From Swiss-Prot:
Protein family according to the UniProt entry: Belongs to the ATPase alpha/beta chains family.
Record-linked PROSITE patterns: ATPASE_ALPHA_BETA
Cellular component aspect of the GO annotation: chloroplast thylakoid membrane; mitochondrion; proton-transporting ATP synthase complex
EC number: 7.1.2.2
Organism: Cuscuta exaltata (Tall dodder)
Keyword ATP-binding attached: yes
Keyword Nucleotide-binding: yes
Role according to the record: Produces ATP from ADP in the presence of a proton gradient across the membrane. The catalytic sites are hosted primarily by the beta subunits.
Name of the protein this chain belongs to: ATP synthase subunit beta, plastid
Quaternary state and interactors: F-type ATPases have 2 components, CF(1) - the catalytic core - and CF(0) - the membrane proton channel. CF(1) has five subunits: alpha(3), beta(3), gamma(1), delta(1), epsilon(1). CF(0) has four main subunits: a(1), b(1), b'(1) and c(9-12).
Underlying gene: atpB
Length: 490
């Protein structure tokens, strides 16, 4: 069994045999440590700072640079308050190791794999290092299949690939985290799958809200914790940059075990992948590297690739990853979101304009893309319906300037009909969420793909032209829209 640097007890005697060094410099979350000649630790090895006298070991660091003169530079995963030059440092001989397997379900961990939910210790008989190689090329599974989410706009216009990588793009406050919570809820209930959630550099309040929501919805089973469907790994925005940079790898390591050993299909949620890049940028500056474009780290592509290439499907199982991507100043050309784009199979772009109109989920139907939207994968009917919906919405977008200047009455009869149908489609793309019931007062709806296609075909065919557009707002399937229209008339 590998030694977990975050566990103590009987392992102290084993630790006594490890290499030892001393802190020679502390610059915020970065430590320089001197080791005896010939006893240098490897890059990525975990170092543990041992407190003075009878204090327990308290701060875990990760080796980032070998400086020469028997010195290494390491980044701390915890606060460095109270550390002093001359303190003893122990080289653990391996990278940071975290618990994996069924014992992680229903629990909340930090970057070091320590439980932080006050439910006692976790079984550490099965552990794994957070730094691992991506699966070999011959192990990869390349078959294409749709992953149904129950969210109309996603399933119809930018469907997700089972075992693929999906990005949720949006600025601050347009609904990325709510959409992720809804996906976790739908997937746990409809597919019964295991999920791992990596909270990377986001608000502590959101992490707490997510945990409470999961307990209420039964995704986390407090009475029988082993029946829970999700493991949570948090590295919040108040934590040191080292923790925020590595917490994504901790979550991924737990997901890899379910895929490779348990041979399961796993969902990995990362909220927010931009914070992973941001933390890497901070660490890069602290290590003295020359900044690249817009102040980002010169190793941006390498760091992103080392994380993303491990998220894949193998012949044993799959990891489907859904990643929220904060877009700084709503600029999709910023190096952080632009680098993320290269790794994704589908993009779900959230629009501030739609959010301002009150259309939730505020998914932009024209900007969102998916490599799965091909007739040979989704079928002719799905593909044709999606294309017609996009064409109608695109024509409406082109006509908006004319409407703003001249008014709706100046349009041709055909264009007026297109605008009316587009407005119905736009509203029908909205949907009440299970996780937003407390805010909206409307019960959440899960809409199957076949039902979604049927609904949009009815709108496009003109059969529902007589119904008022408000009947299509925040409903599930098309039958609910027709019922709502009847209620509006009475």
């Amino acid at each position: 069994m590998r030694i977990n640097p975050t566990t103590y007890g009987s392992e102290i005697s084993l630790i006594e045999k490890k290499n030892r060094g001393r802190i020679v410099q502390i610059i915020g979350p970065v430590l320089d440590v001197a080791f005896p000649p010939g006893k240098m630790p490897n890059i990525y090895n975990a170092l543990v700072v041992k407190g003075r006298d009878t204090e327990q070991m308290n701060v875990t660091c990760e080796v980032q640079q070998l400086l020469g003169n028997n010195r290494v530079r390491a980044v701390a995963m915890n606060d460095t308050d109270g550390l002093m030059r001359g303190m003893e440092v122990i080289d653990m001989g391996t990278p940071i190791t975290v618990p994996v397997g069924g014992s992680t379900l229903g629990r909340i961990f930090n970057v070091l794999g320590e439980p932080v939910d006050n439910f006692g210790p976790v079984d550490t008989n099965t552990t794994s290092t957070i730094h691992r190689s991506a699966p070999a090329f011959i192990q990869l599974d390349t078959k294409l299949s749709i992953f149904e989410t129950g969210i109309k706009v996603v399933d119809l216009l930018a469907p997700y690939r089972r075992g693929g990588k999906i990005g949720l793009f949006g600025g601050a406050g347009v609904g990325k985290t709510v959409l992720i919570m809804e996906l976790i809820n739908n997937i746990a209930k409809a597919h019964g799958g295991v999920s791992v959630f990596g909270g990377v550099g986001e608000r502590t309040r959101e992490g707490n809200d997510l945990y409470m929501e999961m307990k209420e919805s039964g995704v986390i089973n407090e009475k029988n914790i082993t029946e829970s469907k999700v493991a949570l790994v948090y590295g919040q925005m108040n934590e040191p940059p080292g923790a925020r940079m590595r917490v994504g790898l901790t979550a991924l390591t737990m997901a890899e075990y379910f895929r490779d050993v348990n041979e399961q299909d796993v969902l990995l949620f990362i909220d927010n992948i931009f914070r992973f890049v941001q933390a890497g940028s901070e660490v890069s500056a602290l290590l003295g590297r020359m900044p690249s474009a817009v102040g980002y780290q010169p190793t941006l592509s390498t760091e992103m690739g080392s994380l993303q290439e491990r998220i894949t499907s193998t012949k044993e199982g799959s990891i489907t990853s859904i990643q929220a991507v904060y877009v700084p100043a709503d600029d999709l050309t910023d190096p952080a979101p632009a680098t993320t784009f290269a790794h994704l199979d589908a993009t779900t772009v959230l629009s501030r304009g739609l959010a301002a109109k009150g259309i939730y989920p505020a998914v932009d139907p024209l900007d969102s893309t998916s490599m799965m939207l091909q007739p040979r994968i989704v079928g002719e009917e799905h593909y044709e319906t999606a294309q017609k919906v996009k064409q109608t919405l695109q024509r409406y977008k082109e006509l908006q300037d004319i409407i703003a200047i001249l008014g709706l009455d100046e349009l041709s009869e055909e264009d007026r009909l297109t605008v009316a149908r587009a407005r119905k489609i736009e509203r029908f793309l909205s949907q009440p969420f299970f996780v937003a019931e407390v805010f909206t007062g409307s019960p959440g709806k899960y809409v199957g793909l076949a039902e979604t296609i049927r609904g949009f075909n009815l709108i496009l065919s003109g059969e529902l032209d007589s119904l008022p557009e408000q009947a299509f707002y925040l409903v599930g399937n098309i039958d609910e829209a027709t019922k709502k229209a009847m209620d509006l008339k009475t």
